[in-house]
């Protein structure tokens, strides 16, 4: 008898762009049967009236082994998360993988090796305002090769956070990534709030190396009136056969840590941000609006907290995510309960609510494809992203009519409020979310590339 059956649901075929009532049989963590008649199994999930989709793949997160972030990911239908983004990762990918395999995890994890916290720091290039030396670059390339051989799915960059990093060191590492046929996700370098050189820099890297580049959280980088121009530049580069794709969050208001170069006073002034555009997202001042006095207090006493910056150009989110080469992503971080940005619990429910149900910018099939098979193909996750016999049984079962985000900003509500409309999530065939509640099962696997 089958281990698990999902009967009566409307199954999304992301390969053909269709959906049909089908019944799924699962055994040993994989889909083994797709039937037009209901199936018997040890565990039967009745999904009448619900959509059965491949599990969502979050290409830009910072879960990195944090349990609560993993649980929040599962609540919003994510079954695979890519960590180590923005140049920030564990220094040893091999050690991280072994540790996570011994502990288990709520969702699957793939990891990037980070330019700043792993490669630069291990090579001794500790000053983020200075370029690495030739010797340090050579050390970084050796460390990168080791990480890629251990299964990292690429090299991530957070050029905003390391303003001193040279084009030479980025190109050297991108060449290593290309050697292994892996991807470079890049949080672009913004010198001002109107900086488009950041994109030209990436195009230059792509031309010189041929590496596959993923521009991280595109709207968060350019949502101050530059998205239209930025997309035009990207599409022109794609016509030159540069291998470029984008991911984007569902919010106009982004967050990062206070101790990064982003919140240097000079950068705040260059970006023309007002104090009242910044909200403290973590720690004892959670929900407080930034003031000059609070800024200096936190610089001295609380430099490691997260800050949300409000920019408010919502239409640019939709203009970006409607593009066929853009994937949704969360930028989820590892926060304590009740803290953080609403993206940690609301990104994918908000994506389906806004893009499909309310604004009708995407069909349901298109939206599911962009959250599943497209990222699986971009990262080469061959066993993920579609509902086919033999594929891993990563499945998200939701109601398109009721799916919605309930999370809010910390000065208004709960950033980690669970969404509505996602009753079941299976990770490698294990029922990880049942009736909207986490079951405690830790069936996520490490994805080595």
In which residue ranges do the predicted regions lie?
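Structural signature of the urease/amidohydrolase superfamily beta/alpha-barrel
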Residues: 29, 376, 382-407
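Divalent metal-coordination and catalytic microenvironments
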Residues: 9, 24, 29, 49, ...
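C-terminal cap of metal-dependent C-N hydrolases
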Residues: 318-325, 330-331, 396-445
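Divalent-metal coordination cores built from histidine and acidic residues
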Residues: 52, 69-156, 242
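N-terminal metal-binding scaffold of metallo-dependent hydrolase/deaminase domains
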Residues: 1-40, 367, 403-407
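Histidine-centered catalytic micro-motifs
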Residues: 55-65, 159, 184-190
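Active-site neighborhoods of metal-dependent hydrolases
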Residues: 125-126, 130, 134, 140-157, ...
């Amino acid at each position: 008898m089958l281990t698990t059956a999902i009967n009566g649901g409307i199954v999304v075929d992301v390969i053909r762009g269709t959906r049909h009532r089908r019944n799924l049989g699962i055994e040993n963590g994989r889909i083994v049967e797709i039937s037009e008649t209901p199936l018997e199994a040890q565990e039967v999930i009745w999904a009448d009236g619900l959509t059965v989709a491949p599990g969502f793949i979050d290409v830009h997160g910072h879960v990195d082994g944090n349990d609560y972030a993993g649980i929040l990911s599962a609540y919003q239908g994510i079954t695979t998360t890519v960590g180590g983004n923005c140049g920030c990762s564990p220094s040893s990918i091999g050690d991280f993988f072994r540790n996570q395999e011994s502990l288990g995890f709520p969702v699957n994890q793939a990891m990037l090796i980070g330019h700043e916290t792993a490669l630069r720091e291990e090579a001794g290039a500790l000053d983020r305002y200075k370029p690495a030396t030739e010797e340090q670059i050579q050390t970084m390339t050796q460390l990168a090769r080791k990480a890629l051989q251990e299964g990292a799915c690429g090299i991530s960059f957070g050029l905003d956070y390391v303003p001193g990093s040279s084009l030479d060191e980025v190109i050297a590492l991108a060449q290593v990534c290309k050697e292994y046929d892996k991807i470079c996700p890049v949080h672009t370098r913004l010198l001002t709030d109107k900086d488009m050189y950041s994109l030209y820099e990436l195009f230059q890297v792509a031309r010189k190396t041929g590496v596959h580049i993923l521009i991280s959280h595109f709207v968060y980088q350019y949502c101050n009136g530059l998205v239209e121009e930025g997309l035009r530049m990207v599409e022109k580069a794609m016509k030159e056969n540069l291998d470029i794709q984008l991911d984007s969050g569902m919010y106009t208001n982004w967050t990062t840590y206070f101790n990064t170069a982003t919140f240097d006073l000079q950068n705040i002034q260059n970006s023309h941000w007002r104090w009242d555009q910044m909200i403290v997202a973590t720690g004892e001042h959670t929900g407080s609006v930034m003031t000059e006095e609070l800024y200096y207090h936190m610089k001295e006493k609380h430099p490691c907290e997260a800050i949300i910056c409000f920019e408010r150009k919502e239409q640019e989110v939709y203009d970006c995510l409607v593009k066929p080469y853009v994937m949704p992503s969360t930028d989820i971080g590892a926060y304590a309960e009740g803290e953080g940005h609403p993206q940690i619990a609301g990104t994918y429910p908000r994506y389906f609510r806004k893009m499909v149900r309310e604004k009708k910018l995407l069909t349901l099939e298109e939206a599911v494809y962009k959250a599943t098979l497209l990222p699986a193909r971009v990262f080469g996750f061959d066993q993920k992203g579609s509902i086919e016999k033999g594929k891993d049984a990563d499945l998200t079962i939701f109601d398109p009519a009721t799916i919605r985000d309930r999370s809010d900003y910390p000065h208004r509500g709960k950033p980690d409020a669970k969404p509505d409309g996602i009753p079941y999530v299976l990770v490698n065939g294990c029922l990880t979310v049942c009736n909207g509640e986490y079951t405690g099962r830790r069936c996520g696997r490490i994805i080595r590339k």
